[in-house]
Curated annotation (Swiss-Prot):
GO molecular function, one term: ATP-dependent protein folding chaperone
Region (C) residue spans: 555-625
Source superkingdom: Bacteria
SUPFAM superfamilies documented for this protein: ATPase domain of HSP90 chaperone/DNA topoisomerase II/histidine kinase, HSP90 C-terminal domain, Ribosomal protein S5 domain 2-like
Keywords, ordered alphabetically: ATP-binding, Chaperone, Cytoplasm, Nucleotide-binding, Stress response
Name under which the protein is recorded: Chaperone protein HtpG
Lineage of source species: Bacteria, Pseudomonadati, Pseudomonadota, Gammaproteobacteria, Pasteurellales
Organism annotation: Actinobacillus pleuropneumoniae serotype 3 (strain JL03)
Protein's gene: htpG
Amino acid sequence: MSTNQETRGFQSEVKQLLQLMIHSLYSNKEIFLRELISNASDAADKLRFKALSNPALYEGDGELRVRVSFDETLGTLTISDNGIGMNREQVIDHLGTIAKSGTKEFLNSLGTDQAKDSQLIGQFGVGFYSAFIVADKVTVKTRAAGETQAVLWESAGEGDYTVADIEKATRGTDVILHLREEEKEFLSEWRLREIIGKYSDHIGLPVEIQTTEYNEEGKASGQKWEKINKAQALWTRSKNEISDEEYQEFYKHLSHDYNDSLIWAHNKVEGKQEYTSLLYVPAKAPWDMFNREQKHGLKLYVQRVFIMDDAEVFMPNYLRFMRGLLDTNDLPLNVSREILQENKITASLRAALTKRALQLLEKLAKDDQAKYQTFWNEFGLVLKEGVGEDFANKQQIASLFRFASTQTDSSEQTVSLADYVGRMKEGQKAIYFLTADSYVAAKNSPHLELFNKKGIEVLLLSDRIDEWVVGHLTEFDGKPLQSITKSDLDLGDLADKEQEESQKAQQAEFGSFLERAQSYFGERVKKVVLTHRLTDTPAVVSTDNDEMTTQMAKLFAAMGQKAPEVKYTFELNPDHQMVKKIADLTDETEFNDWIELLFEQALLAERGSLENPAAFIKRMNKLLG
């Protein structure tokens, strides 16, 4: 008998997600059972944790398990647990809304490409709502541990759901799926055993199925519950016993990801510290990767008792994409997030797990370049944060970076710093790089002309974070990183001695011209000089080593911060016909117009924009007319 019944509307995002999910994930519809058993397992973990301080929550029933049963006559499939359960408020919070920030933006990003959308929805984590892939109605009966009032939740997965108070003798949750007519394949003991064996063998508590007992004459004599999984936490088993398929299914259980992971590491450490870790590298970035408020981290167990999800303290922020768990004997069972923050054991575990994660990425890069490229394309921007956050591991982190380069003639970031160092020319002392807004802008920068002529490789950096990265990563393998856009560029032994002598002679020849140009610009430029870094372009602008670069100024602006004004050195190519022509001009107005136009062209090539483009166009039209 139900009382206090009310009908409530779904949060709008739930309705949209349900419709998209039913259509996008239908081709792999059996995952609904994995998701519901996984939720039941989590409910058991949470009860164990709460019962540490309040054993009465067990209510005399400490044998935790998940039970799967079906009724062919009613067309229902039921997944039951005796875990933590939910009260009315929790039911409304968990089953009527999606408590994830940015959900609306995520849903708006979905389009009409079903294959792509199914991957995105898989990254989002389908959870309880996956029941609607096969059911046209879902009924939930639940009672929270330690409470007397039970709750009924029911919905057809459309606009609303019903909540009511009911009686329920046992704690925990029953999820009853009223299967669609075309989904009756799941009303089969054989089919259910197959799915549970495939997806849930690793669950750390018994998964039982209702099966028929037969007497000696072969006639059905009743029903019994039979455990059909190993019921041993996967990470406590020997690595030699665990198949790749089991590791992958456990990853999906942990992360609620729809895709396989790229690689994993399962380690048991004994000695001064005792812990087991299981770390995974995902294949796809979650949709909210750059949401700093989104929780991340490892699942924490102490002595095989679940303590918390998203224990972020064990993994640095730049490795927030890592998934997995830590099971340690070195922390107390009553550990809290606050205690973790101030704990020496935590700091030691964090250092060890960070090393383990970086070694796992190194192994992936060494053993499977294609998979590593997949990783880099998804998570490279996040990993780059590490050079500013983790001084102790800076060189190891940098060795994992990949860049575009003049050597590959491709925008794909495939070149490591070790690759670059291995190809350095004899006498080359620095790793040369160029930062720009895009690969195309970098590839066509006039700053490359001299390097292309000499066949010197240059790394092309076009991610917004790159200028910040090279500010923290000043050297690699003993070789300094040097920007080729600096006015005090030094090629060392690679410099052309004859050209240097020629430049000295031209300096005298163009001396009055340079003074004239400097007089015109005044304080607008730091200085006007001749350059031999150009072959085809008449002029460029550059900055000194100790001054803010164009890209860093743009980064400040993107963060809403005011950056110091960038004052450029204006470099002119004395071998270019346009520069020679301007140097010969005697009319002051004409000279000023031409030298200004040249400066604006150089600024446009460097910054991609001008403060006053209309004036630039007017001046160009005037000089062309």
